[in-house]
A protein has these predicted regions:
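Catalytic glutamate of the conserved HExxH
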Residues: 99, 103-111
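Short pre-active-site segment immediately N-terminal to the catalytic Zn-binding motif
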Residues: 64, 73-101
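Post-HEXXH active-site segment of zinc metalloproteases
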Residues: 86, 94, 109-139, 150-153
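Auxiliary, metal-adjacent structural segments of Zn-dependent hydrolase domains
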Residues: 12, 18-74, 143-149
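A structural signal for well-ordered alpha-helical segments within the folded catalytic domains
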Residues: 11-14, 18, 22, 26, ...
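Divalent metal-coordination and catalytic microenvironments
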Residues: 69, 106, 137
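Short, Lys/Arg-rich, polar N-terminal cytosolic tail immediately upstream
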Residues: 1-9
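Low-complexity, intrinsically disordered extramembrane tails and loops of integral membrane proteins
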Residues: 1, 152-155
C-alpha cells in the first residue's frame, strides 16, 4: 500500500513538472482562447484530457489544436469524431477517432517536450501524415499504442 501511495505522489509531481515545463505553450493557448470568448468560445476544464478546453472556436476549417495544456476546439465538445491523418491521406482505412483522445496525446507530448514541442513539430512535418507526433496521436486515439512517437525505439 505504501509503494502505491509513493507512486501516486511521484506521478503527480511529474505531471506538475510537465505542466510547468510546457507553461509557455499553455500561455499562448490561454491568450488565444481568451481573445475569442467574445465570439462564442467556451472555456472548461477537462480532467480526462488534462487540459483547459476552449470549445466552439469560431474560426477555421474544423477540428482542434493543442498548445501545451490548452485545447482549442471548433466543435461543441471533444467527443466529435475525425479521420486519422493516414486515413485522410489515403494510406489506409481506419475508423474515425475521438478528437479529444487525439488531442490528449498532444497534451502529453507537450508536457514531455515543453518549449521544444512546437519547433520539433514543424521540423518533423507540421500538420501532415509524415509527422510522427501526429501519427502517434492517431495510434493513441485508436487504442493501438503510446502517445510517444518513439516508444518502440526505447528498449
Amino acid at each position: 500500500m505504501r509503494a502505491h501511495g509513493l507512486r501516486r505522489v511521484l506521478l503527480c509531481l511529474l505531471r506538475l513538472l510537465g505542466v510547468v515545463w510546457t507553461l509557455p505553450n499553455s500561455l499562448m493557448g490561454l491568450l488565444l482562447g481568451i481573445c475569442v470568448i467574445p465570439w462564442g468560445a467556451r472555456p472548461r476544464l477537462s480532467r480526462s484530457d488534462f487540459a483547459l478546453v476552449f470549445d466552439r472556436w469560431p474560426w477555421g476549417p474544423g477540428g482542434a489544436m493543442t498548445l501545451g495544456n490548452v485545447i482549442i476546439n471548433t466543435a461543441a465538445d471533444l467527443e466529435a469524431l475525425c479521420p486519422t491523418y493516414a486515413h485522410r491521406a489515403g494510406l489506409c482505412q481506419e475508423p474515425r477517432v475521438r478528437i479529444g483522445s487525439h488531442e490528449r496525446a498532444h497534451v502529453w507530448q507537450y508536457m514531455l517536450l515543453g518549449p521544444f514541442f512546437l519547433p520539433l513539430y514543424f521540423v518533423l512535418g507540421g500538420i501532415s501524415v509524415r509527422n510522427p507526433l501526429e501519427r502517434a496521436a492517431d495510434r493513441y486515439a485508436l487504442g493501438q499504442g503510446s502517445w510517444w512517437p518513439w516508444q518502440n525505439s526505447i528498449k
